Amino acid sequence: PLVYHDNSLTKDVLNYTDGDKFDVVLMNPPYGGNEKSDVKSHFPSDMRSSETADLFMVLIMYRLKRNGRAAVIVPDGFLFGADNTKIAIKTKLLRDFNLHTIIRLPGSIFAPYTSIATNILFFDNTCAEGAPEGYSTKETWFYRLDMPEGYKHFSKTKSMKSEHCDPIREWWNDRKEIIIADGDEKSRCYSVEDLIATDCNFDLCKFPKEDEEILPPAELLADYFKKRKALDHEIDKTLAEIQRILGINVNVDEL
Protein backbone atom coordinates (compact mmCIF):
# COMPACT_ATOMS: atom_id res chain seq x y z
CA PRO A 1 0.00 0.00 0.00
CA LEU A 2 1.00 3.61 -0.53
CA VAL A 3 1.64 5.23 2.84
CA TYR A 4 2.56 8.90 3.15
CA HIS A 5 4.01 10.42 6.32
CA ASP A 6 2.39 13.83 6.25
CA ASN A 7 -0.23 16.07 7.83
CA SER A 8 -3.51 15.37 6.05
CA LEU A 9 -4.93 18.72 7.13
CA THR A 10 -2.41 20.93 5.31
CA LYS A 11 -3.94 20.69 1.83
CA ASP A 12 -6.90 22.79 0.71
CA VAL A 13 -9.90 20.44 0.77
CA LEU A 14 -11.45 22.21 -2.22
CA ASN A 15 -8.51 21.14 -4.39
CA TYR A 16 -9.10 17.40 -4.04
CA THR A 17 -10.06 15.64 -7.27
CA ASP A 18 -11.80 12.30 -7.81
CA GLY A 19 -8.39 10.67 -7.98
CA ASP A 20 -7.75 11.74 -4.38
CA LYS A 21 -10.94 10.15 -3.05
CA PHE A 22 -11.65 6.77 -1.47
CA ASP A 23 -14.36 4.11 -1.67
CA VAL A 24 -14.07 3.31 2.04
CA VAL A 25 -12.85 5.43 4.95
CA LEU A 26 -12.30 3.83 8.37
CA MET A 27 -10.82 6.28 10.83
CA ASN A 28 -10.21 6.98 14.48
CA PRO A 29 -8.91 10.55 14.06
CA PRO A 30 -6.94 12.28 16.81
CA TYR A 31 -9.12 14.28 19.15
CA GLY A 32 -8.37 16.73 21.91
CA GLY A 33 -5.87 18.67 19.80
CA ASN A 34 -6.11 22.25 18.55
CA GLU A 35 -5.04 23.43 15.11
CA LYS A 36 -3.48 26.78 14.22
CA SER A 37 -4.85 29.35 11.79
CA ASP A 38 -2.61 28.24 8.90
CA VAL A 39 -4.15 24.75 9.06
CA LYS A 40 -7.72 26.01 9.41
CA SER A 41 -7.27 28.18 6.32
CA HIS A 42 -7.42 25.04 4.16
CA PHE A 43 -11.11 24.55 5.03
CA PRO A 44 -14.32 26.42 4.10
CA SER A 45 -14.76 29.47 6.32
CA ASP A 46 -17.88 28.18 8.09
CA MET A 47 -16.14 24.92 9.06
CA ARG A 48 -12.79 26.22 10.33
CA SER A 49 -12.83 24.56 13.71
CA SER A 50 -9.83 24.62 16.03
CA GLU A 51 -10.52 21.02 17.06
CA THR A 52 -8.59 18.38 15.16
CA ALA A 53 -11.44 15.84 15.17
CA ASP A 54 -13.81 18.36 13.55
CA LEU A 55 -11.36 19.11 10.74
CA PHE A 56 -10.85 15.42 10.04
CA MET A 57 -14.62 15.00 9.72
CA VAL A 58 -14.63 17.75 7.10
CA LEU A 59 -11.63 16.18 5.35
CA ILE A 60 -13.36 12.79 5.19
CA MET A 61 -16.46 14.34 3.62
CA TYR A 62 -14.33 15.90 0.89
CA ARG A 63 -12.37 12.70 0.22
CA LEU A 64 -15.16 10.11 0.14
CA LYS A 65 -16.11 8.96 -3.36
CA ARG A 66 -19.66 8.97 -4.60
CA ASN A 67 -21.30 5.77 -3.23
CA GLY A 68 -18.37 5.46 -0.81
CA ARG A 69 -18.82 4.33 2.79
CA ALA A 70 -17.32 5.67 6.01
CA ALA A 71 -17.12 4.67 9.67
CA VAL A 72 -15.53 7.31 11.89
CA ILE A 73 -14.93 7.42 15.64
CA VAL A 74 -15.65 10.82 17.17
CA PRO A 75 -15.71 12.12 20.76
CA ASP A 76 -18.94 13.01 22.55
CA GLY A 77 -18.13 16.68 22.07
CA PHE A 78 -18.81 16.37 18.35
CA LEU A 79 -22.30 15.03 19.03
CA PHE A 80 -23.51 17.69 21.44
CA GLY A 81 -21.32 20.58 20.25
CA ALA A 82 -23.55 23.60 19.57
CA ASP A 83 -21.12 26.22 18.28
CA ASN A 84 -21.71 27.52 14.75
CA THR A 85 -18.78 25.59 13.30
CA LYS A 86 -19.91 22.21 14.61
CA ILE A 87 -23.48 22.87 13.52
CA ALA A 88 -22.21 23.71 10.01
CA ILE A 89 -20.18 20.48 9.84
CA LYS A 90 -23.07 18.32 11.05
CA THR A 91 -25.51 20.08 8.74
CA LYS A 92 -23.24 19.33 5.76
CA LEU A 93 -23.11 15.71 6.90
CA LEU A 94 -26.91 15.48 6.82
CA ARG A 95 -27.30 17.44 3.58
CA ASP A 96 -24.60 15.78 1.48
CA PHE A 97 -24.34 12.30 3.03
CA ASN A 98 -26.59 9.56 4.33
CA LEU A 99 -25.80 9.45 8.05
CA HIS A 100 -27.67 6.23 8.76
CA THR A 101 -26.25 5.05 12.11
CA ILE A 102 -24.58 6.35 15.26
CA ILE A 103 -23.27 3.86 17.84
CA ARG A 104 -22.70 5.20 21.37
CA LEU A 105 -19.67 3.48 22.93
CA PRO A 106 -18.90 2.96 26.63
CA GLY A 107 -16.71 5.69 28.11
CA SER A 108 -13.82 3.40 29.08
CA ILE A 109 -13.59 1.56 25.76
CA PHE A 110 -10.09 2.89 25.02
CA ALA A 111 -8.84 2.69 28.62
CA PRO A 112 -6.16 3.14 29.85
CA TYR A 113 -5.13 5.33 26.91
CA THR A 114 -8.05 7.76 27.15
CA SER A 115 -11.23 8.10 29.17
CA ILE A 116 -12.93 10.31 26.57
CA ALA A 117 -16.36 8.94 25.61
CA THR A 118 -16.57 8.09 21.91
CA ASN A 119 -19.04 7.12 19.20
CA ILE A 120 -19.00 5.59 15.72
CA LEU A 121 -20.62 7.49 12.86
CA PHE A 122 -21.61 5.38 9.84
CA PHE A 123 -22.44 7.27 6.66
CA ASP A 124 -22.44 6.84 2.89
CA ASN A 125 -21.93 9.27 0.05
CA THR A 126 -25.40 8.49 -1.26
CA CYS A 127 -28.88 9.94 -1.00
CA ALA A 128 -31.28 7.85 1.04
CA GLU A 129 -34.54 6.97 -0.67
CA GLY A 130 -37.27 9.25 0.62
CA ALA A 131 -34.89 11.87 2.02
CA PRO A 132 -36.49 15.34 2.13
CA GLU A 133 -35.46 17.90 -0.47
CA GLY A 134 -32.06 19.40 0.27
CA TYR A 135 -30.88 16.45 2.36
CA SER A 136 -29.25 13.09 1.67
CA THR A 137 -30.14 11.67 5.09
CA LYS A 138 -33.71 10.52 5.66
CA GLU A 139 -33.28 9.13 9.18
CA THR A 140 -30.54 8.18 11.61
CA TRP A 141 -30.55 5.19 13.93
CA PHE A 142 -28.93 5.55 17.35
CA TYR A 143 -27.81 2.53 19.39
CA ARG A 144 -26.14 2.53 22.80
CA LEU A 145 -23.68 -0.26 23.54
CA ASP A 146 -23.90 -0.80 27.29
CA MET A 147 -21.14 -2.33 29.40
CA PRO A 148 -21.20 -6.15 29.28
CA GLU A 149 -22.44 -8.02 32.31
CA GLY A 150 -19.79 -8.35 34.98
CA TYR A 151 -17.90 -5.23 33.87
CA LYS A 152 -17.96 -1.86 35.60
CA HIS A 153 -15.46 -0.45 33.14
CA PHE A 154 -12.80 -1.58 30.67
CA SER A 155 -9.12 -1.47 31.58
CA LYS A 156 -5.75 -2.67 30.34
CA THR A 157 -6.29 -6.05 32.01
CA LYS A 158 -10.01 -6.22 31.17
CA SER A 159 -10.09 -4.75 27.69
CA MET A 160 -12.94 -4.87 25.23
CA LYS A 161 -13.26 -8.06 23.18
CA SER A 162 -14.87 -8.73 19.82
CA GLU A 163 -17.76 -10.63 21.41
CA HIS A 164 -18.68 -7.52 23.38
CA CYS A 165 -19.87 -6.10 20.04
CA ASP A 166 -22.29 -8.99 19.47
CA PRO A 167 -25.29 -6.91 20.66
CA ILE A 168 -24.51 -4.38 17.92
CA ARG A 169 -24.31 -7.10 15.28
CA GLU A 170 -27.61 -8.64 16.37
CA TRP A 171 -29.38 -5.28 16.46
CA TRP A 172 -27.83 -4.11 13.17
CA ASN A 173 -29.55 -6.83 11.15
CA ASP A 174 -32.89 -6.50 12.96
CA ARG A 175 -33.23 -2.84 13.89
CA LYS A 176 -35.86 -1.90 16.40
CA GLU A 177 -36.32 0.82 18.95
CA ILE A 178 -35.42 -0.24 22.50
CA ILE A 179 -36.77 1.74 25.42
CA ILE A 180 -35.87 0.54 28.90
CA ALA A 181 -37.69 1.46 32.11
CA ASP A 182 -38.35 5.14 32.88
CA GLY A 183 -38.06 6.17 29.25
CA ASP A 184 -34.36 5.29 28.97
CA GLU A 185 -33.76 5.06 25.22
CA LYS A 186 -31.17 2.46 24.25
CA SER A 187 -32.04 2.57 20.56
CA ARG A 188 -34.20 4.90 18.52
CA CYS A 189 -34.61 6.16 14.99
CA TYR A 190 -34.74 9.94 14.44
CA SER A 191 -35.80 11.64 11.23
CA VAL A 192 -33.50 14.24 9.71
CA GLU A 193 -36.19 16.82 10.52
CA ASP A 194 -35.91 15.83 14.20
CA LEU A 195 -32.14 16.31 14.13
CA ILE A 196 -32.27 19.65 12.33
CA ALA A 197 -34.89 20.91 14.80
CA THR A 198 -32.37 20.41 17.64
CA ASP A 199 -29.61 22.35 15.82
CA CYS A 200 -27.96 19.02 15.02
CA ASN A 201 -27.66 17.83 18.60
CA PHE A 202 -26.72 14.17 18.11
CA ASP A 203 -26.35 13.51 21.85
CA LEU A 204 -29.22 10.99 21.86
CA CYS A 205 -29.69 7.54 23.43
CA LYS A 206 -27.27 8.69 26.11
CA PHE A 207 -25.84 6.59 28.91
CA PRO A 208 -27.89 7.01 32.09
CA LYS A 209 -26.18 8.91 34.87
CA GLU A 210 -25.13 6.70 37.75
CA ASP A 211 -26.24 7.83 41.18
CA GLU A 212 -23.28 8.16 43.52
CA GLU A 213 -23.74 6.02 46.60
CA ILE A 214 -22.79 7.77 49.84
CA LEU A 215 -22.12 5.27 52.63
CA PRO A 216 -22.52 5.99 56.34
CA PRO A 217 -19.21 6.90 58.10
CA ALA A 218 -19.04 3.55 59.91
CA GLU A 219 -19.30 1.62 56.61
CA LEU A 220 -16.72 3.88 54.95
CA LEU A 221 -14.21 3.28 57.75
CA ALA A 222 -14.89 -0.46 57.78
CA ASP A 223 -14.31 -0.62 54.02
CA TYR A 224 -11.08 1.39 54.39
CA PHE A 225 -9.69 -0.91 57.12
CA LYS A 226 -10.61 -3.99 55.08
CA LYS A 227 -8.82 -2.73 51.98
CA ARG A 228 -5.80 -1.53 53.99
CA LYS A 229 -5.49 -4.95 55.64
CA ALA A 230 -5.55 -6.68 52.26
CA LEU A 231 -2.96 -4.24 50.89
CA ASP A 232 -0.68 -4.71 53.93
CA HIS A 233 -0.88 -8.46 53.42
CA GLU A 234 0.23 -8.13 49.78
CA ILE A 235 3.09 -5.81 50.79
CA ASP A 236 4.27 -8.26 53.47
CA LYS A 237 4.25 -11.12 50.94
CA THR A 238 6.30 -9.08 48.47
CA LEU A 239 8.85 -8.01 51.11
CA ALA A 240 9.19 -11.60 52.33
CA GLU A 241 9.92 -12.76 48.78
CA ILE A 242 12.53 -10.03 48.33
CA GLN A 243 14.26 -11.09 51.58
CA ARG A 244 14.24 -14.72 50.44
CA ILE A 245 15.86 -13.82 47.12
CA LEU A 246 18.50 -11.63 48.80
CA GLY A 247 19.12 -14.19 51.55
CA ILE A 248 18.50 -11.74 54.37
CA ASN A 249 16.11 -11.56 57.29
CA VAL A 250 15.00 -8.21 58.66
CA ASN A 251 13.39 -8.31 62.09
CA VAL A 252 10.67 -5.70 61.79
CA ASP A 253 9.94 -5.79 65.53
CA GLU A 254 13.41 -4.41 66.26
CA LEU A 255 12.98 -1.37 63.99
What is each of the regions a protein language model found here?
Residues 1:
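Short, conserved SAM-binding/catalytic segment
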Residues 5, 10-255:
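A conserved structural/catalytic subdomain of Rossmann-like adenosyl-cofactor enzymes
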